[in-house]
């Protein structure tokens, strides 16, 4: 009797399943989970917005240091009062500029998205060369053989040009995520100029001396921070210093009037060479989006 009861207990689940097809089947060993299903269940990584654009204003302040202006190719009557070589106490400087600007960057898929490449776009800079020291305050040729020439001091204005300084920096985000994102950067630039011209009224009274400016490369040091305003909009403060940027300008075929010596009327001063360590400080404030 006990054996019959034990057999009935064993057969009860099977008989119940046969009577009710909708009943769950007896437990079996479960197959291994589908790897595809597991992969789908794994949450995706947050999307990285790799392109960013910031629109704002950039202020350029040259921290200029000048060598003395040098004269060359002096000949004829001008040699009576001038000589080739540096003008003692003379110098040149470059004026400041403020322009609208756009900072465009791309976040590289390396170093946990901490590294990006960026550039600054904007209209050409107005580069104004100014005379300093004795070049500004004293006549180029006050006397000739002890006779006053009547040549005037040239004053502060020298010349101007348009500059298009392409710049690329590699930027490292110290804190790549969060509401405040400080960063540092390192890069290179070169000051390329066009449309250079002499604008000084004393130097252009007789003729139009031609000005040429050589390309001036420089090393870019950068630091700044961004503050998140919304999920994709950031405000930026950015400071750059360009080191080792030397601008070399030359003014050719300078002629000046000598009103107190009618015999000559004008004299050919020759060529003036200017060398300025520009080394500008560049400050930018901008706002923009990540894409």
Where are these regions (language model features)?
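Hydrophobic, well-structured mid-protein blocks that either form specific transmembrane helices
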Residues: 157-189, 193
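Repeated loop/turn-to-beta-strand initiation elements of outer-membrane beta-barrel proteins
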Residues: 111-117, 178-180, 233-235
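Short glycine/proline- and aromatic-enriched beta-strand/turn motifs that initiate or cap beta-hairpins
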Residues: 19-106, 282-284, 288-290
């Amino acid at each position: 009797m006990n054996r019959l009861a034990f057999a009935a207990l064993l057969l009860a689940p099977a008989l119940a399943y046969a009577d009710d097809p909708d009943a769950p089947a007896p437990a079996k060993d479960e197959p291994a989970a589908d790897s595809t299903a597991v992969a789908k269940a794994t949450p995706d990584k947050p999307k990285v917005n790799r392109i960013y654009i910031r629109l704002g204003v950039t202020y350029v302040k040259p921290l200029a240091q000048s060598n003395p202006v040098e004269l060359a190719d002096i000949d004829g009557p001008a040699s009576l009062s001038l000589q080739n070589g540096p003008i003692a106490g003379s110098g040149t400087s470059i004026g400041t500029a403020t322009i609208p600007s756009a900072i465009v960057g791309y976040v590289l898929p390396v170093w946990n998205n901490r590294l990006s490449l960026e550039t600054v776009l904007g209209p050409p800079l107005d580069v104004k060369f100014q005379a300093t020291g004795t070049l500004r305050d004293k006549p180029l040729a006050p006397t000739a053989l002890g006779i006053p020439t009547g040549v005037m001091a040239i004053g502060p204005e020298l010349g101007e040009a348009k500059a298009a300084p392409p710049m690329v920096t590699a930027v490292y985000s110290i804190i790549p995520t969060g509401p405040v994102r400080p960063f540092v950067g390192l890069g290179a630039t070169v000051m390329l100029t066009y449309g250079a011209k002499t604008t000084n009224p004393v130097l252009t009274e007789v003729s139009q001396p031609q000005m040429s400016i050589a390309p001036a490369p420089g090393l870019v040091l950068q630091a700044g921070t961004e503050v998140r305003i919304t999920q994709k909009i950031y405000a930026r403060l950015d400071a750059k210093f360009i080191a080792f940027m030397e601008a070399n300008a030359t003014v050719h075929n300078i002629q000046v009037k000598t009103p107190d010596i009618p015999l000559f009327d004008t004299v050919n001063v020759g060529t003036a060479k200017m060398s300025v360590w520009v080394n500008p400080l560049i400050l930018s404030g901008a706002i923009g989006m990540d894409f």
